[in-house]
Amino acid sequence: MSDFSPDMKNLDIDPIPVDCDLSYNTNIEVLKFTAQIIYIITGIFLNSAVLGTILWRCREVYSTNSFFTLFSVDCIANISILITEGLFARFFIYFTPICPVLADYFQSPLVGFKIIMLLTHHVSICKSLLQVLLVLNRMTCVLFPITHDSIWRKSLKYVISAVFLIPFCADWNIAISRVYMQSTYGGFWVSYFKKVSWASQSRFQLVFIIIALSFTFICTAITLLKLPERSKEIEKAISNATVIISIGFTFKVLFQIYYSFFFSYTDASSPVYGFSFLALDFLTVGSPIVMICVSRNLRTHIFKSKRKNQTLSKMLTRTSGMVIAR
């Protein structure tokens, strides 16, 4: 996100030319686009499958489980990010033949793409908050096994509302700033000129991601230490999933530090920018994959026939800690 301002009279309304970098090999860039779109679409499918299973197909199994309710909201966040930062961003960045064709149409203020940019950053913060709630949920399941369900049942609608409302405190600078298309690799993608120089969106995100990572490490450590010996095999899979997701958050923190303190408007085509996409993809595509792998019941509900699912659902216990890892 840029402090750089081109030489123009009115930054809010004057056209900003898009310079297409024609030095990139079209075939290689389109190949990058194709490879990424394949796993992005796969990620959208898997998140949608998990979401549909939890909220509709097997609602009677998961509706009383606070962890899976939170995870379904996380799937919604993943789908939103994969559509905006995945399908839209990769198309304009890597499908280079469109740059010379469309460049002239993106010189004026971009209201539609400002909404996309706002949605992307808003949902990214939501995802950090959801990570906090997910690991906190697992920890309370171990520390307060008797009252865990009632605690979360009473507070769940409030914490989910907070997940969507809190990021608004970080959206305002994009809302009042000029969004424009910046040359990125052989294509282009959105950036913005900060109206308020200190209110960097990347720094806002860094704060929330560090909080999420801290909660992840602390809550996981407490969960493992306090977990009854007889339950360790049951919860081991969940803890492994937490560690894997934590690795993704660690990489995300590193990239956010770069964007917060070292990024300049000329770096949009640097390799670091491309690698930051991969860290984001690891979280959004990897999250449902990890959960499907560690939860046999969820895996069965997603991939087995409807009749088998109905039979299995009747046999399942609805205990929060147990149903996750079976």
From Swiss-Prot:
Belongs to the nematode receptor-like protein srg family. The gene is srg-14. Pfam families: Srg (PF02118). The chain crosses the membrane at residues 36-56, 67-83, 115-135, 156-176, 204-224, 243-263, 274-294. GO terms for biological process: sensory perception of chemical stimulus. GO terms for molecular function: transmembrane signaling receptor activity. Keywords: Membrane, Transmembrane, Transmembrane helix. One of its GO terms (cellular component) is membrane. This is Serpentine receptor class gamma-14. It is found in: Membrane. The keyword Transmembrane helix applies. PANTHER family: SERPENTINE RECEPTOR CLASS GAMMA-11-RELATED, SERPENTINE RECEPTOR CLASS GAMMA-RELATED. It comes from Caenorhabditis elegans. It is a multi-pass membrane protein. Disulfide bonds: none annotated. Coiled coil: none annotated.
